Design a protein with these regions (language model features):
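Conserved cytochrome P450 K-helix E-x-x-R motif and the immediately C-terminal K′/meander segment
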Residues: 26-48, 219, 223, 307-348
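Cytochrome P450 proximal C-terminal region
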Residues: 2-13, 44, 131-135, 152, ...
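Cytochrome P450 fold signature focused on the C-terminal beta-domain
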Residues: 232-237, 297-317, 330-350, 359, ...
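Residue-level recognition of short, solvent-exposed, well-ordered loop/turn junctions
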Residues: 353-354
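Conserved cytochrome P450 K-helix/beta-meander segment immediately N-terminal to the heme-binding cysteine loop
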Residues: 360-387
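Cytochrome P450 catalytic-core helices
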Residues: 274-293, 297-299, 408-425
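N-terminal membrane-proximal hinge/A-helix region immediately C-terminal to the signal-anchor transmembrane segment
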Residues: 2-106, 121, 125-133, 155, ...
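Cytochrome P450 heme-thiolate monooxygenase catalytic core
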Residues: 1-18, 79-85, 103, 119-277, ...
């Protein structure tokens, strides 16, 4: 692990040492179970592509042109990997995140209007209220250290629960949260059977049990969806109302109850976990570099004048946005994405065969020495001119037709919460409690982000 990084003199925040020598199948599996980032070689920050073989042939691709080939030019030839689908399907079914081909396309067309600029902006008051509640909780902690990871998980789950099912009491939010957390903890780790390429029909220990525990929660969700469909939308439509009204403009198809449920669960997972992690890392980085924090606070205080941030403020908080962008570069929630090649191809000279695993190690991509100046340094100014960032070198939300449908929602929420809290508190580190970047399904700060929060 990196040396203590909570000083302004040390300009390198925490970083996981990447692999420097090849390992066998069993060791590779053990490393992945502990931290998926462990399988990324240091070479991945220096080379355009790396190839190898464990039980199956694999390739890690870091060249932006080749990544464009995977995510845009030949996207149909690179569906999500079988391992990814096996991990997530029991929780979110054949939703937008998992589905491929025509089944994905009609769902995307039906869902896209839900996340229009108008609809996302209309949900802003929920984010503002969550930011205010979070500020009050932090203030009540007094002179004690605050785990900003826990605070951000609470804040973002409150937001996604409110904008998904509103506050009509038809759905037990805590039960949803617990079921999803249990699934990730119990079943979200790669099985040795996955690494060995064993058939899908062979049960994965832990995953079967966790899937069974999800069944009751899904039944409750179905009942809530059917009750809402019978009752109709509220004064301000939430995501469920918008999805119920949604229709594929090409086929006229609408989602069934199970399709609605799977997509809502996808939005709940993606809509709070990734934003919470981005915010937690952002607070860590602001505490790491007090100069950046002071500059951000000055911007936030000038714009907000003591109130919580709103949707209308987001465009006037460019430096806050730059901090979030830089946090996503250094600590992307999806540190590695994986695809399974369907056809022969060539990527930067690498021969790609059908059934090869093709990975984009986004964690390494954001630290690549040929793509970024001083890549391990925390420097929000590198995003001052976003047009200077090479496309496909920066992929916090993916790219191509499968780019994250909720990206604008996530950015709006993150800016509102970060600006509100920085305008009211000065965050400083707790010595000896550096977080450790660990990826199971998402890249989390293991141990939490413990900071002192002094009112200003």
């Amino acid at each position: 692990m990196a040396k203590d990084a909570f000083t302004d003199d040390n300009r390198t925040p925490v970083r996981i040492p990447l692999a420097t020598e090849p390992v066998g199948i069993l060791k590779s599996w053990q490393m992945m179970r502990e931290n998926v980032l462990n399988i990324i070689p240091e070479q991945a920050t220096e080379e355009p592509v790396i190839s190898g073989k464990t039980a199956k042939r694999w390739h890690m691709v870091m060249d932006p042109g080749a990544i464009q080939q995977i995510l845009l030019d030949r996207v149909e030839d690179y569906p999500k990997s079988t391992v990814t689908k096996n991990l997530l399907r029991p929780a979110i079914g054949e939703s937008l995140f998992i589905a491929e081909g025509a089944h994905w396309r009609w769902q995307r067309r039906a869902s896209a209007p839900v996340f229009s600029h108008r609809n996302v902006a209309a949900l802003g008051p929920v984010m503002t209220a969550a930011a205010e509640r979070t500020a009050q909780r932090v203030a009540q902690a007094g002179p004690r250290a605050v785990n900003m990871l826990d605070e951000m998980i609470t804040a973002t789950f409150d937001v996604i629960a409110e904008v998904t099912f509103s506050d009509d009491g038809s759905f037990d939010r805590n039960a949803v949260h617990k079921a999803l957390e249990t699934y990730v903890n119990d079943a979200g780790r790669v099985s040795l059977l996955d690494v060995l390429g064993m058939p899908d029909w062979i049960p994965r220990p832990g995953r079967t049990t966790a899937s069974a525990e999800m069944a009751q929660m899904k039944q409750d969700a179905d009942a809530a969806i059917e009750a809402r469909a019978a009752r109709g939308p509220g004064d301000v439509p939430d995501l469920l109302d918008l999805l119920l009204a949604g229709q594929d403009p090409k086929s006229g198809r609408s989602m069934t109850t199970s399709e609605l449920r799977d997509n809502l669960l996808t939005f709940i997972v993606a809509g709070h976990e990734t934003t919470a992690l981005t915010l937690a890392w952002s607070f860590y980085l602001c505490a790491f570099d007090s100069r950046v924090q002071d500059k951000a606070r000055a911007e936030a205080q000038k714009v907000l004048q003591g109130r919580a941030a709103t949707t209308a403020d987001v465009e006037n908080l460019p430096y806050i946005r730059q901090i979030i962008d830089e946090a996503l570069r250094l600590y992307p929630p999806a540190g590695v994405v994986s695809r399974t090649a369907q056809k022969r191809d060539t990527l930067c000279g690498a021969d790609i065969q059908p059934d090869d695993t093709v990975m984009i190690p986004i964690y390494a991509l954001g630290r690549h020495k040929l793509l970024w100046d001083n890549p391990d340094q925390f420097d929000p100014d590198r995003f001052q001119n976003r047009k200077s960032i090479k496309r496909y070198a920066y992929l916090p939300f993916g790219d191509g037709p499968r780019i994250c449908i909720g990206a604008s929602f996530a950015v709006q929420e993150a800016v509102i919460i970060l600006a509100t809290l920085l305008s009211r508190f000065r965050f400083t580190p707790v010595k000896g409690r550096d977080p450790k970047p660990v990826m199971v399904i998402t890249l989390r700060p293991e141990g939490g982000v413990w900071l002192m929060a002094e009112p200003v």
